[in-house]
């Protein structure tokens, strides 16, 4: 019995001893792993550099090894093979210890107290040294260029230099959103960033995760404490551009992608690049940039009144990357990047869309079949573009939503109007759309209208059968039997009295249908109309009848173009030949006027003039087309001749006789001017003296620009000025001017202001002066014998003026009516 107990105790002691050894080995392994961690190894490397201690493996190249080490036999092939075998042996020992630790992990609580760190250091000092050598050799061999590492080892960094000197070489740090900026900013070129990427390869973070971390902030802090700028990746810009193209700028998916970009520390230049690449048109980018600058200006004014001194330095140039901040945008405070992203996204949401009524919230109305939630979304989106994401505008938006909603939604909201917008959405979620009473009623009425339209089928007026109209009927025509080719146009199978063609098969213009035709539709002819100029009461073209050659009761005669003519704006006024009218006697007077339809509707301008029928010749009419090209065909009726009929029944004027230019009498005062000299006249206009030449051919007076005071206002006239030259838009006085002659005569006129060498006084001044032209007292005897004979028949008496009773009247001369149609007129 005693032997059995002794055996059990001995077995238990052996078991405890074995567990003790296993636990001891496990704790030693933990200490080794802790000492070989990245941070501890960096601290030891920094300590060695601080005290000038150099690693014995400074490089494998011959140029970096001292000659003394080569003479002592270090780093020879035998030494390298020995150390390599030692490293493999150490790996096997660590693997065996790890296997034993996994077997006894459940008995961790049965072990003795852990060994002190000093004992562990003494026991594994040699192993630790070998591990450091192995790690340094591993880093130097595969993850860092030899030249860069040699420079770093030859120039150790002083202790405490830089804010991040205690961190291991190559570690990438992400700055907090509102942390203080490092003292220095380093913009690394591409080659240095590749070197930094190699130095970060000894991190425990996988390379894919490191790439995602780099995307988080295009501006990030490097390993040496400086900031590095990395551009936004191509895939992110591509996804944003595709989202804008497929869904639009304000789609939810597009805005979510912008919110993801807002979490990054994007510089102003980055935002401009991203927006320019994402928006489809350059005009949209310019609109966004203008809105962004406006919002940045408002944000800069708010920053100037901030409490913190850092935020007061965030000016407009800083937020937009202009001025002194155009070259270096990575040294901003971390909070400034958040403001830049906020202003950029806010202005993105404010971009206008084609066809929308932006800025008019009262026009956002809920449709009859639109759900209440969609209507609220449209109203909220339109309000955000005007007010931004402001809570102060929430009451106004709610009031507009209530007023612009449908009648059913307002009835549901009214009992709980003070509950808020979220409660309105819950109550009205089933209202709106085609399933409401109003929607069902509209659908029922629409279906009834469709059924009624199906039953109300019209029948053919030719055959009387339903299903088609007369124009599509294939049955023979009841009125005329079998149809033949039209004798009028020659282009279709229909009767001539039903022809609606404007031109025949040869291109000639057809006359309008006769109003006395046997077949006239009930609603009038609905076919095409004549393409020529319209005539008020008469057709423009058509067969000329003999009755049109004679004066009608209205005393108007239509004149036809004698040939084809083309008028253009740059041609100014051109004479257009017209056909003479042989039925009018010679000496007939008339006034040429344009037709209303031709002048007003078609753009042709016929300039009025007095026309006297002389000997048979080729007559012409002055026409122009200032608004476009106008084509005149031969035979078109363009001008009208308004005949001036004789007036033999005119009574004598009972009032005082008014003598004006053109009248003469015994008591008339004459101004005799010799034609050897230029007839000059000096006038005082608005207190200033002007000297000019009398021009009987000018309707309006003209003042030279050399005489015109600069203080007097002028404007451009809408009428053209035609004389020896042509002026399309002449300058004219803006106000009426008062003139006064040396004899006290006064009047008002509105002169033209043109660059002429002299001033010209026209008939607007000479009429008020009472000037006349006369050759009665000419040295050659005055009028010719033929003229005196004609004047004698009209009642002229030499030396007593022109007129029957020497009355000097101003009305037109009334010739004696002759039955043989001779003289100036006829009764």
Swiss-Prot record:
The record marks 22-23, 217-218, 261-262, 441-442 as: Cleavage. Residues 119-133 have a biased composition (Acidic residues). Residues 783-827 form the G-patch domain. Pfam families: dUTPase, G-patch, Gag_p24, Gag_p24_C, RVP, zf-CCHC, zf-CCHC_5. InterPro entries: Aspartic_peptidase_AS, dUTPase-like, dUTPase-like_sf, G_patch_dom, Gag_p24_C, Peptidase_A2_cat, Peptidase_aspartic_dom_sf, Primate_lentivir_Gag_pol-like. Residues 690-765 form the Peptidase A2 domain. Its EC number is 3.4.23.-. Residues 1-25 form the signal peptide. One of its GO terms (molecular function) is zinc ion binding. The active site is at residue 695. One of its GO terms (biological process) is viral process. A zinc finger (CCHC-type) spans 458-475, 484-501. It is an enzyme of class 3 (hydrolase). SMART domains: G_patch (SM00443), ZnF_C2HC (SM00343). Residues 515-529 have a biased composition (Polar residues). It comes from the Viruses. This is Intracisternal A-particle Gag-related polyprotein. It comes from Mouse intracisternal a-particle MIA14 (IAP-MIA14). The gene is gag.
């Amino acid at each position: 019995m005693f032997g059995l107990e002794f055996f059990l105790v001995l077995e238990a002691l052996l078991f405890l001893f074995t567990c003790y050894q296993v636990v001891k080995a496990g704790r030693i392994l933990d200490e080794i792993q802790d000492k070989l961690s990245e941070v501890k190894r960096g601290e030891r490397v920094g300590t060695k550099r601080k005290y000038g201690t150099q690693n014995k493996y400074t490089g494998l190249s011959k140029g970096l090894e001292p000659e003394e080490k080569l003479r002592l036999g270090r780093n020879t092939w035998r030494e390298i093979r020995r150390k390599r075998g030692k490293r493999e042996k150490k790996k096997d020992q660590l693997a065996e210890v790890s296997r034993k630790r996994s077997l006894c992990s459940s008995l961790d609580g049965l072990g003795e107290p852990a060994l002190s760190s000093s004992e562990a250091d003494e026991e594994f000092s040699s192993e630790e040294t070998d591990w450091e050598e192995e790690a340094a050799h591993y880093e130097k061999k595969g993850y860092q260029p030899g030249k860069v590492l040699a420079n770093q080892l030859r120039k150790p960094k002083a202790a405490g230099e830089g804010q991040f000197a205690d961190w291991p070489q190559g570690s990438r740090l992400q700055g907090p959103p509102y942390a203080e900026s490092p003292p220095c900013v380093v913009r690394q070129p591409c080659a240095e960033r590749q070197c930094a990427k190699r130095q970060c390869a000894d991190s425990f973070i996988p390379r894919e995760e490191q790439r995602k971390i780099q995307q988080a902030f295009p501006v990030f802090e490097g390993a040496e404490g400086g900031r590095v700028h990395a551009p936004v990746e191509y895939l992110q810009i591509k996804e944003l551009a595709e989202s804008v193209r497929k869904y639009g700028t304000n789609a939810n998916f597009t805005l979510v992608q912008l919110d993801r970009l807002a979490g990054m520390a994007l510089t102003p230049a980055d935002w401009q690049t991203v927006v320019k690449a994402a928006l489809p048109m350059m005009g949209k980018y310019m609109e966004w940039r203008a809105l962004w600058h406006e919002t940045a200006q408002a944000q800069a004014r708010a920053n100037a009144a901030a409490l913190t001194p850092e935020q007061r330095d965030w000016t407009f140039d800083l937020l937009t990357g202009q001025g002194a901040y155009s070259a270096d945008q990575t040294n901003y405070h971390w909070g400034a990047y958040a403001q830049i992203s906020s202003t950029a996204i806010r202005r993105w949401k404010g971009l206008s869309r084609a066809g929308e009524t932006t800025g008019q919230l009262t026009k956002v109305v809920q449709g009859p079949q639109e759900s209440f939630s969609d209507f609220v979304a449209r109203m909220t989106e339109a309000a955000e573009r005007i007010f931004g994401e402001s809570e102060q505008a929430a009451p106004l938006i709610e009031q507009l939503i209530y007023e612009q909603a449908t009648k059913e939604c307002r009835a549901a909201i009214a009992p709980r109007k003070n509950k808020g917008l979220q409660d309105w959405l819950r109550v009205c979620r089933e209202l709106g759309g085609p399933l409401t009473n109003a929607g069902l009623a509209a659908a029922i009425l629409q279906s009834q209208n469709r059924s009624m339209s199906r039953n109300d089928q019209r029948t053919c007026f030719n055959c009387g059968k339903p299903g088609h109209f007369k124009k599509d009927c294939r049955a023979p025509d009841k009125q005329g039997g079998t149809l033949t080719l039209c004798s009028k146009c020659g282009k279709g199978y229909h009767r001539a009295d039903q022809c609606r063609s404007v031109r025949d098969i040869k291109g000639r213009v057809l006359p309008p249908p006769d109003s006395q035709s046997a077949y006239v539709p009930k609603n009038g002819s609905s076919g095409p109309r004549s393409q020529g100029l319209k005539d008020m009461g008469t057709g423009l073209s058509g067969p000329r009848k003999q009755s049109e050659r004679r004066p009608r009761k209205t005393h108007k005669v239509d004149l036809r173009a004698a040939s084809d003519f083309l008028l253009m704006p740059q041609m100014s006024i051109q004479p257009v030949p017209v056909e003479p009218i042989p039925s009018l006697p010679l000496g007939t007077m008339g006034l040429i006027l344009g037709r209303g339809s031709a002048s007003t509707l078609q753009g042709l301008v016929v300039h009025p003039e007095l026309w006297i029928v002389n000997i048979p010749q080729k007559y012409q009419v002055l026409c122009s087309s200032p608004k476009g090209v106008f084509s005149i065909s031969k035979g078109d009726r363009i001008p009208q001749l308004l005949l001036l009929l004789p007036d033999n029944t005119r009574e004598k004027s009972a009032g005082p006789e008014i003598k004006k230019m053109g009248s003469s009498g015994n008591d008339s005062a004459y101004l005799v001017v010799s034609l050897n000299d230029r007839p000059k006249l000096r006038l005082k206009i608005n207190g200033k003296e002007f000297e000019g030449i009398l021009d009987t051919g000018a309707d309006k007076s003209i003042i030279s620009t050399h005489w015109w005071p600069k203080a007097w206002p002028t404007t451009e006239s809408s009428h053209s000025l035609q004389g020896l030259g042509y002026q399309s838009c002449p300058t004219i006085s803006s106000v009426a001017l008062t003139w006064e002659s040396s004899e006290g005569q006064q009047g008002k006129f509105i002169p033209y202001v043109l660059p002429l060498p002299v001033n010209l006084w026209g008939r607007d001044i000479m009429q008020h002066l009472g000037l006349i032209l006369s050759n009665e007292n000419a040295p050659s005897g005055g009028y010719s014998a033929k003229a005196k004979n004609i004047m004698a028949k009209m009642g002229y008496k030499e030396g007593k003026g022109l007129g029957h009773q020497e009355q000097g009247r101003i009305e037109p001369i009334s010739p004696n009516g002759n039955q043989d149609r001779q003289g100036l007129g006829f009764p």
